[in-house]
Amino acid sequence: MAEQKTSGRRLRQPIVVVLGHVDHGKTTLLDKIRGTTVAAKEPGLITQHVGASFVPASVIEKLAEPLKKIIPFKLIIPGLLFIDTPGHELFANLRRRGGSVADFAILVVDINEGFQPQTYESIEILRQRRVPFVVAANKIDKIPGWRANPDTPFLISLQKQAQRVREELERRLWDNIISKLYELGFQADRFDRIRDFTRTVAVIPISAKTGEGIAELLAVLAGLTQRYLQHRLRFAEGPAKGVILEIREQPGLGTAADVVIYDGVLRKGDIIVTGGLNGPVITHVRALLMPKPLQEIRVAKRELEPVEEVYAAAGVRIVAPGLEEAIAGAPVFVARDEGEAKQLAEKVRREIEALRIKTEAEGVIVKADTLGSLEAMIEALRKRDIPIRYADVGPVAKRDVIEAVASRELNKFYGVILAFNVKVLPEAEEEAKKHGITIFTNNVIYRLLEDFEKWYKEQVEAERRKELEKLVRPGKIRLLPGYVFRRSNPAIVGVEVLGGVIKPGYPLMREDGKRIGTIHQIQDKGKVIHEARAGMAVAISIRGHVMVGRHIDEGDVLYTDIPEQHAVLWLTKFKSELTDDEMVVLKEIIKIKRKQNPAYAVVLGKPQGAKP
């Protein structure tokens, strides 16, 4: 391939990220890709970036040589730039307004385990950021009977497998990956069976361990990006645009920012504008650092050396004054002069302010370590219809706890703090203990949300049970003839529960609606019990101005005297909590009550209970 000169560049290299569930092989795949590149021994073309690895087109073509008869292609992109750190937390920082800096993604799925929680979360964030992806169906070497052919293209290795092994591969591809993509609304198929890649997600079986299928993975990635993303990959000579991946200390030079440049040119001395915790940061590039060219992979510590300029797409470390204020996930723009810097600063300020949430409404408090993770948290919460009162970048501080207390006043279930990958300051911890505010912390978004949702459900259920316990349930009893043990003060009688339930503390009324007292105690065969249900015969004591023979008689039927508000709740919020016989008794109670008050337990203008 002709050497890519700066002036003659037509397309820049696509930026590729690797996502997937923990232990599905993301890091192994990246290591394999880097190792393959070094092993290809292309002098001068093996370039490492800060936080990224570049695989030149010539290496891809060399690897894919055996495939040319099956998949003919010619590369016009310079190669592929892989972001070194896998996972969707870092991917979240590759943000740009309306999408992502990443041009393409590899979703790594263990073909034997299939989709796991982080697989779904990865797809969710790819959808949110509108990033196209292919699936690397990893660990084919773990399929029973698979005979490994190291560093061989998948299609060639497949021909060397037994028929039953091929069939097992097909079954696992379908059951664990392709069918799951269909369930999520994606058409998908094995890459070599696809005619229209714009409509179908390509699934490439690989082994990151043995290197099988890596040739196809790189060839498909390169082919798809240059064919469908040319408009996005056009090289621009103008001022650079990028995004901060990470802020770090550079020994001897102070604070530095690891940045992915996705457009234009960045030069030493340029004015750059980025986003900080307390507003936009305008500064000058003091130094640009890139790793020295590698002779072999896995060098313990890569040395960085200064360079004068960097062209997109690239990973570079920028040293500049004031970067200690900058935050990961913030955009980076090069300004031509101070006037343009002020305009860009306003643009950055608006972009970051749009992410921060500050309201007086009910909702959870969100703190995250970077703008990217904050954005991902907000999107994930909104998708789950969880309201947000306050969201910002930085550690959990005392003021966040005060916000949570204010939110709890409006809704007790939302007075909590969700802290993603950030510290909780000691004074915040103290304040939280003082006010009983729960702080959820985790460095995996889906686990953080899972923990909160579990807690939320438990709290709502506990509150519901508490409310339920306060309600008088429908109950109907008959005084058993011959079982009057005491006529008054309190009256003690034997009763049969005809329907519903009775409990101590429940008021009782006659069939004419007149209240006659309250159940004080219930006994069954001499033992005190807390409730009696339909079909039971028990002894009850009744407190109040009631005398057997004057106010009630043997054989009388009594009902629990349900307050109107309780009846409304039984007919609406807690209807599903009533048994069939309780519902029958409730209708009878409502009928009795309506003779005295026709509006009793009328809900939304419609009488409830006469014929519910």
Swiss-Prot record:
Coiled-coil zones: none
G5: region residues: 207-209
Record domain tr-type G: where: 11-229
Short name of any one Pfam family annotated for the protein: GTP_EFTU_D4
Segments of this protein annotated with the region G3: 84-87
Region (G1): 20-27
CDD domains registered for this protein in UniProt: aeIF5B_II, IF2_aeIF5B_IV, IF2_eIF5B
Annotated segments matching region G4: 138-141
One MF term in the entry's GO annotations: GTPase activity
InterPro entries, A to Z: EFTU-type (IPR029459), P-loop_NTPase (IPR027417), Small_GTP-bd (IPR005225), T_Tr_GTP-bd_dom (IPR000795), TF_aIF-2_arc (IPR004544), TIF_IF2 (IPR015760), TIF_IF2_dom3 (IPR023115), TIF_IF2_dom3_sf (IPR036925)
General function of this protein: Function in general translation initiation by promoting the binding of the formylmethionine-tRNA to ribosomes. Seems to function along with eIF-2.
Family membership noted in the UniProt record: Belongs to the TRAFAC class translation factor GTPase superfamily. Classic translation factor GTPase family. IF-2 subfamily.
Name assigned to this protein: Probable translation initiation factor IF-2
Biological source species: Hyperthermus butylicus (strain DSM 5456 / JCM 9403 / PLM1-5)
